[in-house]
Design a protein with these regions (language model features):
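Kelch-like beta-propeller repeat domains
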Residues: 2-5, 11-13, 21, 25-350
Length: 350
């Protein structure tokens, strides 16, 4: 598996003055002064091409499920192991898109989706599918995060903005914690310390800045709001921070990035290199990656000191993609940017 960073990227980097710790042509390192994010080639694509899918990882596999393809809504699931070998498990029980996914125990859970589905599908370490109790309210454009022994599914849209939260434990038993402080959809969620955070979203005709935090006992608190209200964005955890990046501020696209530490203190970071919405995020090593967006191939990386760098872009500009981490790789799969995409880009630390 070779490492690629094209001549055009090298030229652009030098012309812009971007510091490069390592540049690679093929697999030949030209410079090497420390850990660097690189994108690997020849990852087997998804089957089929699609957008509006969801992804999460548990155990030794990252799973990409659901979405909308050229032939319609799909139930397809693709699994990638730590060596980036792809297998195709049993599909979702119901085809759907704009669903979400989270891990708990040995399971990856896919929940919700259009059109206002309440279905939850769970895949164990052997990729066997079971169908636990459905969500309390069917909805799409919801968000999910793991905290302690629970996977939480919050918000969404089901004819109206939803504040519902469903929690599944490691035995796939569902309970219903306190609802979000306001109903909203197209929100984002991530975990930091002892908290799962649900931030932003679209509430009525306004871009929300609200953040709700759930601890391991599923008690809800309300930390400082996002610096900018926005929706159709993404969140990711790295080291001691949960980062919320990009989005739509009900008109202009946003490049804002907010970081919450384990005490729920918020700081505002160097913004993304390009304002964009409907992007995806994943972490690898000590880097949080924000990739793609409408319509961009850009990737922004934030390390544990919250310093931003700009690694090689995705292989193609696309949005409504999904991302997950497995082994030493952060994977960005699917999306649309003209044609629907089956591409999977993998980032690792060299």
């Amino acid at each position: 598996m070779g490492i690629y960073l094209g001549v055009s990227e090298i030229k652009k980097a030098f012309l812009s003055g971007t510091p490069l710790k390592q540049i690679c042509l093929g697999a030949i390192p030209l410079l090497a002064t420390g850990p660097e994010l690189v994108c690997v080639e020849a990852v087997t694509p998804l089957s089929p091409e699609r957008f509006g899918l969801a992804a999460a990882a548990a155990g030794s596999c990252a799973l990409f499920g659901g979405g909308l393809s050229n032939s319609g809504v799909v139930a397809a699931v693709d699994a990638y192991d730590a060596s980036l070998t792809r297998t195709v498990p049993t599909p979702l029980s119901v085809a759907r898109h704009f669903l979400t996914a989270a891990a708990v125990g040995e399971y990856v859970l896919f929940g919700g989706g259009a059109t206002s589905s309440a279905i939850v599908d769970a895949y164990d370490a052997s990729l066997t599918r079971t169908t636990p109790t459905a969500l309390g309210v069917g909805r799409r454009l919801l968000a999910a995060a793991r905290i302690g022994n629970y996977a939480l599914f919050g918000g969404g849209h089901s004819g109206s903005d939803s504040a519902a939260v469903d929690a599944y434990d490691g035995s796939l038993t569902r309970i219903t914690p306190a609802a979000l402080s306001e109903g909203r959809y197209a929100l984002a969620a991530a975990t930091v310390g002892n908290y799962a955070l649900f931030g932003g979203g679209l509430a009525g005709s306004a871009a929300a800045s609200t953040v709700d935090a759930y601890d391991e006992s599923l008690t809800r608190t309300s930390p400082a709001a996002l610096s900018v209200g926005r929706y159709s964005f993404t969140a990711v955890s790295v080291e001691n921070y949960a980062l919320f990046g990009g989005g739509n501020a009900y008109g202009p696209k946003s490049a804002a990035v907010d970081a919450y530490d384990a005490s729920l203190t918020r700081s505002t970071l160097t913004p993304l290199s390009r304002a964009r919405n409907n992007l995806a995020s994943a972490a690898v090593g000590n880097f949080a990656l924000f990739g793609g967006g409408e319509t961009s191939a850009a990737v922004d990386a934030y390390d544990e000191a919250l310093t931003r760098t700009v690694p090689a872009p995705l292989s193609a500009a696309r949005f409504d993609l999904a991302a997950a981490t497995v082994g030493d790789y952060a994977l960005f799969g699917g999306g649309r940017g003209g044609p629907y995409s089956a591409a999977v880009d993998a980032y690792t630390i060299n």
